[in-house]
């Protein structure tokens, strides 16, 4: 094995024109707001990549240097740097960031950054909030990323300790330009890789002693129940655990299939593949390879150990020989049999033979890059190991408690990870262990999972603990199935966002303050987040109110008009409100003019291939555009020629509304040559004036009323992928008009209050309409009831 394949991509050497250097210091001007500072007593500096940083080759920014003798002054449009040329100290190195209050925009060396935080290594045993590590964004406008103690990357693909006791850190002084800050972080530390398409479907996972027969029966039950999954996770009992002879210790680590449970592993995995599943196996590699393992003889021989000695092969990711043996003799043979990727469940600390080197980082780095060896897109599944871990997706967040407190923390935890570039967390949806049974909690957690980077249902080894939908009450079962289907419908949208995350440096999930950093309200809703370009999400993390049968979520609605994804209800933005929903829905809002491509699903379909049938949601607004991007979903390299794009546009003016699907461009071989389109127009309640394909009237178009979003459905079948579709509505097409009184009636009908109060409230609303709010506030109503009435009557549309 050539270990050079483990060298990080990028050019770690900066441009000479960007450097200001002295006998013991070096300052590198990467951008006008991103500066590298180094100090070393021995006068040596680091030009190799590190565990965190892989590229310093930035265009030289504009800057000015003023040499004041004993003090050095550097100026850019964003920063003033004042440095005394000595060992870094609070009095000797000061940076002022442009904009804002001067007292809040000054940093002295050693100041603890007051940033917006980032993420954490794990949520293991979390029951609510946990501390988070630093991020790169701050309301003060600056933050610091310390790279002094990471390892350097050698040209041979191995890590190496750095020389001397040197200071090496990066100052981010972007003010509130959070998106620009993040994009330059990716430029410095490596881009987020493109994920395989199958990762965006639902994952099934359970810590349970499955047998091959039981797992197959489970998959067939999912098919019967129309609950789609695309990834089958098999936890640790796939290998020998309880049958390990005591002389070898525990069975926590293992690489030998338990043939009692899985008598024919290749056949089992082939069966799963034929049913549309990719397979990942759980491994805890800390105990190395012991003599009872099937692979032990060949592993021992390759490591220079006599197999007859039964001497264990110790786990050591600092040994190049072990790394080669570990992959070629343990993992590659099992991948040949059908394993698609590995769940690296490392829980054994941060110590290796090399001081300061974290074994988790080594596992993530080497496993991810090795996973390309079969010519497929790289993937691993493991915990976060510090800044730069975004290069090794997907993240496994660990074993959370099954409580409402855990659920409440998870939306914030997920969105906030973008502040350190970590965009692909996978949580134990529904919680892992302890806690309590609460069907409503499970429903809300699954809803969150569907609108999360990954949706992986999971639970611990407990006969009462499982996330199969049919184990819950009928209402929650229905909710779970509906949302599992929705996740698979969302794959075309999610996969396009996957490309955007990798190429544009824009994570799928982003905190609300990214786009409105000067709005105080955006910092007050930590559980709200953008979900790609078209949507924002405000998950419900509280129980239903017994009076209304609804639960609320505090929500900041950004500027503009927004529409409810599920029911088409319109909201005027620029304000903070409580949004109330029953158990069947959650607050997901779509910005005006949005176009959202979905997979059109009827019945059971767990395929994540580029679909032949597409469903497109089109929302009111003057204009909108969405480019659907598709490739084969698993090609190892992200090349332009792999992709096909389908551009969709919508315009609305005094002449009417026009929606166009342009002919597919690019590598059309990876998509069906003919497609059927279900186009749903929110709030338009007339048939189109005209439907054309390549300029010719399409007489076979079908039309239907869309009751869910109060609109019109246009159906076209077997349209060539290289054809243009155009749907035109007349300027006077009927538009849905909301009936406030009817909406209030529906709420009151279900409310658990006196009939007299129902009658009184309804009378006030009928008489005063949206002007009824002050009267309702004075009526001493249940807070939940008043909240939902306020939502309906103050939406502004």
Residue ranges and their predicted role:
Residues 593-696, 719-721, 728-797:
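Accessory, solvent-exposed terminal regions and/or long lumenal/extracellular loops of proteins
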């Amino acid at each position: 094995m050539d270990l050079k394949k483990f060298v990080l991509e990028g050019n770690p050497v900066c441009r000479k024109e960007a450097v200001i250097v002295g006998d013991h210091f070096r300052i590198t001007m990467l951008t006008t707001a991103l500066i590298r500072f180094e100090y070393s007593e021995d006068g040596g500096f680091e030009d190799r990549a590190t565990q965190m940083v892989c590229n310093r080759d930035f265009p030289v920014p504009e800057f000015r240097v003023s040499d004041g003798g004993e003090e050095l002054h550097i100026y850019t449009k964003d920063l003033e740097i004042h440095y005394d040329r000595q060992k870094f100290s609070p009095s000797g190195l000061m940076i002022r960031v442009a904009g804002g209050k001067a007292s809040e925009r000054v940093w002295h060396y050693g100041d603890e950054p007051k940033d917006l935080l980032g993420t954490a290594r794990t949520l293991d045993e979390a029951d609510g909030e946990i501390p988070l590590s630093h991020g790169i964004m701050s309301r003060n406008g600056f933050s610091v990323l310390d790279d002094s103690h990471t390892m350097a990357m050698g040209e041979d693909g191995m890590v190496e300790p750095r020389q001397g006791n040197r200071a090496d850190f990066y100052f981010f002084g972007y003010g509130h330009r959070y998106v620009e800050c993040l994009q330059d972080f990716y430029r410095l530390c490596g881009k987020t890789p493109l994920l395989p398409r199958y990762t965006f479907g639902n994952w099934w996972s359970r810590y349970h002693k499955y047998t091959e027969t039981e797992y197959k029966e489970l998959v067939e039950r999912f098919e019967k129940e129309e609950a789609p999954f695309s990834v089958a996770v098999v936890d640790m009992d796939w290998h020998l655990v309880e049958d390990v002879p005591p002389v070898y210790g525990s069975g926590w680590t293992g690489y030998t299939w338990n043939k009692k449970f899985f008598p024919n592993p290749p056949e089992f995995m082939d069966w799963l593949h034929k049913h549309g599943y990719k397979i990942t196996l759980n491994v805890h590699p800390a105990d190395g390879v012991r003599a009872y393992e099937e692979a032990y003889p060949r592993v021992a021989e390759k490591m220079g150990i006599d197999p007859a000695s039964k001497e264990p092969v110790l786990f050591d990711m600092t040994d190049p020989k072990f790394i080669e043996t570990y992959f070629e003799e343990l993992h590659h043979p099992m991948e040949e049999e059908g394993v698609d990727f590995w769940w690296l469940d490392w829980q054994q600390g941060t110590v290796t033979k090399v001081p300061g080197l974290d074994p988790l980082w080594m596992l993530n780095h080497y496993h991810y890059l090795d996973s390309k060896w079969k010519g497929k897109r790289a993937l691993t599944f493991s915990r976060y190991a510090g800044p730069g871990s975004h290069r090794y997706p997907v993240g496994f967040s660990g074993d959370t408690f099954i409580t409402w407190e855990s659920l409440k923390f998870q939306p914030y935890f997920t969105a906030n990870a973008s502040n350190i570039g970590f965009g692909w967390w996978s949580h134990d949806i529904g919680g892992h262990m302890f806690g309590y049974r609460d069907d409503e909690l499970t429903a809300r957690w699954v809803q969150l999972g569907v609108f999360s980077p990954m949706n992986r249902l999971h639970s611990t080894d407990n006969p009462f603990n499982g996330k199969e939908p049919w184990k819950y009450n009928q209402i929650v079962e229905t909710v779970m199935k509906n949302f599992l289907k929705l996740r698979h419908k969302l794959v075309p949208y999610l996969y396009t966002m996957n490309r955007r995350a990798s190429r544009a440096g824009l994570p799928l999930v982003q905190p609300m303050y990214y786009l409105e950093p000067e709005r105080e309200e955006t910092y007050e809703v930590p559980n709200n987040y953008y979900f790609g370009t078209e949507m924002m999400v405000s998950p419900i993390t509280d129980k239903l109110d017994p009076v209304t049968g609804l639960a609320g979520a505090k929500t900041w609605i950004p500027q503009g008009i927004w529409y409810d994804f599920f029911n088409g209800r319109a909201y005027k933005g620029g304000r903070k409100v409580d949004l109330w929903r029953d158990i069947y829905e959650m607050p997901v809002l779509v910005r005006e003019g949005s176009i959202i491509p979905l997979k059109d699903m009827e019945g059971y379909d767990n395929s994540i291939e580029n679909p032949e049938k597409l469903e497109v949601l089109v929302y009111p607004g003057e204009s909108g555009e969405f480019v659907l991007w598709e490739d084969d979903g698993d090609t190892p390299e992200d090349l332009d020629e792999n992709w096909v794009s389908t551009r969709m546009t919508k315009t609305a003016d005094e002449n009417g509304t026009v929606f166009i699907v342009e002919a597919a461009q690019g590598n059309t071989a990876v998509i069906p040559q003919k497609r059927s389109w279900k186009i749903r127009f929110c709030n338009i309640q007339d048939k189109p004036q005209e439907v054309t394909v390549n300029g010719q009237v399409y007489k076979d178009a079908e039309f239907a009323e869309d009751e869910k979003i109060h609109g019109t459905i246009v159906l076209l079948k077997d349209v060539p992928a290289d054809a243009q579709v155009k749907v035109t509505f007349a300027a006077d097409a009927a538009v849905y008009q909301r009936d406030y009184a009817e909406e209030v009636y529906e709420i009151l009908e279900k409310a658990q209050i006196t009939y007299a109060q129902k009658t009184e409230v309804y009378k006030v609303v009928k008489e005063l309409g949206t002007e009824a709010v002050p009267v309702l506030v004075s009526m001493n109503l249940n807070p939940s009831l008043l909240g939902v009435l306020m939502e309906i009557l103050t939406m502004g549309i």
